[in-house]
Design a protein with these regions (language model features):
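Charge-rich, N-proximal long alpha-helical rod segments
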Residues: 1-45
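Structured alpha/beta interaction-core segments
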Residues: 50-133
Length: 133
């Protein structure tokens, strides 16, 4: 049986350590990009809120096209609006602002839309929940 060369073993270990470092740096880079994208997309949500509020008061085709285009871009990036109205209240998806007349523990009103990014909460919705009158 041939003797193991200690220098060869040390070189193999160093090479394996280097390969692990490369993998770890790449994983960190991907996580950082996801974090930055999440922060950026979250900052766009109040802009959508403002544009939708303006759209409700001003009937302008250009404004509607701009809102639709922004929503399309967000959708392409994995941002989805939550549809919570008339569904069971889920504290993981929404914050309850107040209890209101309506079916117990069911969302009866949405004060601020909530959004998901790749099926994770980007911004929780702010809702009114039925108190079961």
């Amino acid at each position: 049986m041939a003797k193991k060369n200690p220098q060869e073993e040390q070189l193999k270990r160093a090479l394996a350590d280097y390969q692990n470092l490369i993998k770890r740096v790449e994983a960190d880079r991907v996580e950082f990009i996801k974090y930055v994208l999440t922060q950026f997309l979250a900052k766009l949500l109040p802009v959508i809120d403002d544009l939708e509020a303006a759209e409700a008061h001003i009937k302008d085709q250009g404004l509607t096209l701009a809102v639709d285009k922004l929503k399309t871009i967000l959708n392409e990036e994995g941002v989805k609006e939550m549809a919570l109205l008339n569904r069971a209240f889920d504290p993981k998806l929404a914050e309850c602002l107040e209890l209101a007349p309506g079916k117990k523990d069911q969302v009866v009103g949405v004060a601020q839309k909530g959004y998901l990014l790749n099926d994770k909460v980007l911004r929780p919705a702010r809702v009114k929940v039925g108190k079961g009158d």
